[in-house]
C-alpha cells in the first residue's frame, strides 16, 4: 500500500549543457512489489495515480511485472506524483518531490477493500503515505484492519526529509504505526531518528518493545543487522560496483519478504533467516550494480545463478 510515482532521473546533458532526464517508475512500496514479484512472490499494489499519461504508464509497468493492479485507483482531479532524482559520483541519491496535492496522497479508506486485505499474507507500507491525510488515515486504518484479519504487517519508515514539515513531525508520524508492525526494515540513517542511537543492538532492542518480531537494519555495502526476538546477528553484504543505490533497500526488503511469506515467524530458525538475508543482500547488490530502481531489479534466476 502506498505511493507509485515518476522518478525524473538526470541522464546527462545535451551539447548545449541542458540537463536530460529519463522518466522512471518509482515509489518504495511499488518498487518492493515488483522486486518480490520478480523473485517469485504473488504481489498486488494498492495506491492512487492521476488520470494522466504518467499514471497509465505506471499501471502498465506494474502489470507487466505481474503485480496485481486491480486495487489501483485513478484520481481525475490530482496529478500523478513526480520526484526529481539526482545521483552523485558515488551513486548516492538526492530527491526533490513535486507532491503538494498529488494523487498518491488522496488515497482514502474506501479505496482499500477488506477483500484485498483478506487475500494477503503480508501487508506492507512505508512512511511516505503518512506525510499527509487522507493517505495517512487510510494507510493506518488498512494496517489495523489487515492485522485483525491475520496478515503479517511490514513497514519501511523510508525517511525523505523534504516531504515533512519538520524533523519532529516526521519522527512522531514515523513512530505511530510501530505497535502494529511485525517486520520492520530501517536503514542505518533511520535508526537514530527513531531511537536516538546509532547502536544496532540497543536501537533494535528499543524498537522491539513495540512488539515488533523481526527487525532489519540495512548497512549499505556492509550488509544487514537483524534482531529476531532476543537473537541478533549480522549478514555480510555482497560486494559490487555501484551504478546507483536507487531501489536497493526496496529490492532487499522485497527479496526478504518473497521468502518470508513462505515461512511462519513462530517456526523460523536463525539459520533459515540468515540464508534469506544472504539471498536478499545478493538481490540488492544486483540492483545497486545497475541504474534505476524497477528496471534494475533482478529475476530469481539472476539471484540464484
Which residues does each PLM region occupy?
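Glycine-rich phosphate/adenosyl-contacting loop at the front of the ribokinase-like
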Residues: 1-68, 107
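Short beta-strand scaffold segments in enzyme catalytic cores
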Residues: 34, 82-86, 223-226
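Proline-centered loop/turn at the N-terminus of a beta-strand
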Residues: 42, 152, 183, 213-214
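Conserved N-terminal subdomain of the carbohydrate kinase-like
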Residues: 42-125, 304-305
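Conserved beta-alpha-beta core of the PfkB/ribokinase-like small-molecule kinase fold
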Residues: 128-205, 222-223
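Conserved phosphate-binding/catalytic region of the ribokinase-like
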Residues: 144-145, 196-305
Amino acid at each position: 500500500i502506498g505511493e507509485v510515482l515518476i522518478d525524473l532521473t538526470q541522464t546527462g546533458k545535451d551539447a548545449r549543457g541542458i540537463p536530460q532526464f529519463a522518466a522512471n517508475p518509482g515509489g518504495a512500496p511499488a518498487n518492493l512489489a515488483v522486486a518480490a514479484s520478480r523473485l517469485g512472490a504473488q504481489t498486488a499494489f494498492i495506491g492512487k495515480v492521476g488520470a494522466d499519461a504518467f499514471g497509465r504508464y505506471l499501471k502498465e509497468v506494474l502489470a507487466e511485472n505481474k503485480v496485481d493492479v486491480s486495487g489501483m485507483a485513478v484520481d481525475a482531479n490530482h496529478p500523478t506524483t513526480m520526484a526529481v532524482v539526482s545521483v552523485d559520483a558515488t551513486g548516492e541519491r538526492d530527491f526533490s518531490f513535486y507532491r503538494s496535492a498529488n494523487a498518491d496522497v488522496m488515497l482514502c479508506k474506501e479505496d482499500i477493500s477488506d477483500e484485498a486485505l483478506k487475500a494477503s499474507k503480508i501487508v506492507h507500507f512505508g512512511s511516505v503515505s503518512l506525510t499527509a491525510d487522507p493517505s495517512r488515515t487510510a494507510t493506518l486504518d488498512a494496517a489495523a484492519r489487515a492485522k485483525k484479519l491475520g496478515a503479517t504487517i511490514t513497514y519501511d519508515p523510508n525517511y525523505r526529509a523534504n516531504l515533512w514539515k519538520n524533523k519532529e513531525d516526521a519522527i512522531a508520524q514515523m513512530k505511530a504505526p510501530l505497535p502494529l508492525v511485525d517486520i520492520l526494515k530501517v536503514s542505518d540513517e533511520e535508526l537514530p531518528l527513531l531511537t536516538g542511537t546509532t547502536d544496532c543492538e540497543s536501537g533494535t532492542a528499543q524498537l522491539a518493545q513495540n512488539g515488533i518480531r523481526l527487525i532489519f537494519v540495512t548497512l549499505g555495502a556492509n550488509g544487514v543487522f537483524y534482531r529476531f526476538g532476543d537473537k541478533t546477528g549480522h549478514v555480510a553484504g555482497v560486494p559490487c560496483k555501484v551504478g546507483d543505490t536507487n531501489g536497493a533497500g526496496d529490492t532487499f526488503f522485497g527479496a526478504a519478504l518473497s521468502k518470508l511469506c513462505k515461512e511462519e515467524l513462530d517456526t523460523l530458525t536463525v539459520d533459515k533467516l540468515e540464508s534469506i538475508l544472504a539471498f536478499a543482500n545478493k538481490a540488492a547488490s544486483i540492483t545497486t550494480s545497475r541504474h534505476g530502481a524497477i528496471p534494475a531489479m533482478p529475476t530469481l534466476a539472476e539471484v540464484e545463478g
